[in-house]
UniProtKB/Swiss-Prot annotation:
Lineage top rank: taxon: Bacteria
GO biological process annotation, one example: isopentenyl diphosphate biosynthetic process, methylerythritol 4-phosphate pathway
Function: Converts 2C-methyl-D-erythritol 2,4-cyclodiphosphate (ME-2,4cPP) into 1-hydroxy-2-methyl-2-(E)-butenyl 4-diphosphate.
Stated name of the protein: 4-hydroxy-3-methylbut-2-en-1-yl diphosphate synthase (flavodoxin)
Residue positions binding [4Fe-4S] cluster: C270, C273, C305, E312
The enzyme's E.C. designation: 1.17.7.3
Alphabetical UniProt keywords: 4Fe-4S, Iron, Iron-sulfur, Isoprene biosynthesis, Metal-binding, Oxidoreductase
Entry's Gene Ontology molecular function annotations: 4 iron, 4 sulfur cluster binding; 4-hydroxy-3-methylbut-2-en-1-yl diphosphate synthase activity (ferredoxin); 4-hydroxy-3-methylbut-2-enyl-diphosphate synthase activity (flavodoxin); iron ion binding
PANTHER family from the UniProt entry: 4-HYDROXY-3-METHYLBUT-2-EN-1-YL DIPHOSPHATE SYNTHASE, 4-HYDROXY-3-METHYLBUT-2-EN-1-YL DIPHOSPHATE SYNTHASE (FERREDOXIN), CHLOROPLASTIC
InterPro entries, per the entry: Dihydropteroate_synth-like_sf, IspG_bac, IspG_bac-typ, NO2/SO3_Rdtase_4Fe4S_sf
Record keyword Protease present: no
Length: 369
């Protein structure tokens, strides 16, 4: 039963992406991106709903052309979560999705075109209260910066970002967030560190093109974990070559591990060894699958033997320690003994009961003011 995070977050300006606050004292938002064909409205809406069910706060949708812009407008009417339109090159697409109710525009002012085109996009955003995300990526740096630095570097990423920030500053537009992404962890981390010292706008964190489910999760956890532990970051996206729902799950797991957000169960489980008194791996796999629907924050310990079991179980809302028989702890106190027969069924029942009690207790606390 872990407490508040010891992390002191960087001070930043608060903006709003739809009804979701980003920056300032707002919780760190978890974002993902659809990988469907945007013109396939039904498929895109279906995927967005799955992301919402997983707890996503903001969803980005690619809008490569005017047909996709019209489809985006239909999608926007069918979902409740804030949508970011990802736009490059054609400023008219940005103007159209602004008319259709987009919640945020992801652009690079540098590839939108002439000053008058950037001004038109900024004016449309200002008139409708739409924030902008400046997205700098190591794979698409401006040619002059590639020539100046020879290759992508943290300094090159930051110079590109500040160039775009100054562009918006000249237009007196401050409702924006910035990202400086790279696939190399050290490059991305250093770029964000440098940028965090130079602007007050919120930062959107990500390790771009991180990889598949396993490798991308590791890269993102290492890179974003370093930054978040230093208080840097206001919204995150875990870029995975996998089902976007996995991005949301990994994002919450990273935030939970740093006590920055709580959603669903935080499992503490041993890797198992020959001392285990029940099949820890099988038990964990079954519990994770069965309890995905629980949103209430709970610490659940599943430890196979008595070496570390009692200590871990006492720190959890619900803890299981392997033994003969196994022992269940509730709120740090021994509660009942269980055999291996129907172990998962009984444990699931106890966890759900504890979750219901916590919801009731939290509601009573809120009611008392």
């Amino acid at each position: 039963m872990h407490g508040e995070s010891p992390i002191k977050r960087r001070e930043s300006r608060k903006i709003w992406v739809g009804n979701v606050p980003v920056g300032g004292d707002a919780p760190i938002a978890v974002q993902s991106m659809t990988n469907t064909d945007t013109n396939d409205v039904a498929a895109t809406v279906g995927q967005i709903q799955r992301l919402v069910d997983a707890g996503v706060d903001i969803v980005r949708v690619s809008v490569p052309d005017m047909d996709a812009a019209e489809a985006f407008g239909k999608i926007k009417q069918l979902v409740s979560v804030p949508l970011v339109a990802d736009i490059h090159f054609d400023y008219k697409i940005a103007l159209r999705v602004a008319e259709l109710g987009v919640d945020c525009l992801r652009i690079n002012p540098g590839n939108i075109g002439r000053e008058d085109r950037v001004r038109a996009v900024v004016d449309a955003a200002r008139d409708r209260g739409i924030p902008i995300r400046i997205g700098v990526n190591a794979g698409s740096l401006e040619k002059d910066l590639q020539k100046k630095y020879g290759e992508p570097t943290p300094a090159a990423l930051v110079e590109s970002a500040l160039r775009h920030v100054e562009h918006l500053d000249r237009l007196d537009f401050q409702d924006f967030k910035v990202s400086v992404k790279a696939s190399d962890v050290f490059m991305a981390v250093e770029a964000y560190r440098l940028l965090a010292k130079q602007i007050i706008q919120p930062l959107h964190l990500g390790i771009t093109e991180a990889g598949g489910l396993r490798s991308g999760t590791v890269k993102s956890a290492v890179g974003l974990g370093m930054l978040l532990a230093e208080g840097i970051g206001d919204t995150i996206r875990i870029s995975l070559a996998a089902d976007p729902v996995e991005e949301v799950k990994v994002g919450y797991d990273i935030l939970k591990s740093l006590h920055l957000r709580s959603r669903g169960i935080n499992f503490i489980a041993c890797p198992s060894c020959s001392r285990q008194n029940f099949d820890v791996v099988k038990t964990m796999n079954e519990l994770e699958g069965r309890l995905e629907d629980l949103l209430v924050p709970l610490d659940v310990a599943v430890i196979g033997c008595v070496v570390n079991g009692p200590g871990e179980a006492k720190e959890a809302h619900v803890g299981l320690t392997g033994g003969t028989p196994n022992l269940i702890y509730i709120d740090g106190k021994p509660a009942q003994k269980l055999t291996n027969d129907n172990l998962v069924d009984e444990l699931e029942k106890l966890i759900r009961q504890k979750a219901a009690e916590k919801v009731e207790a939290d509601a009573a606390l809120i009611a008392r003011g």
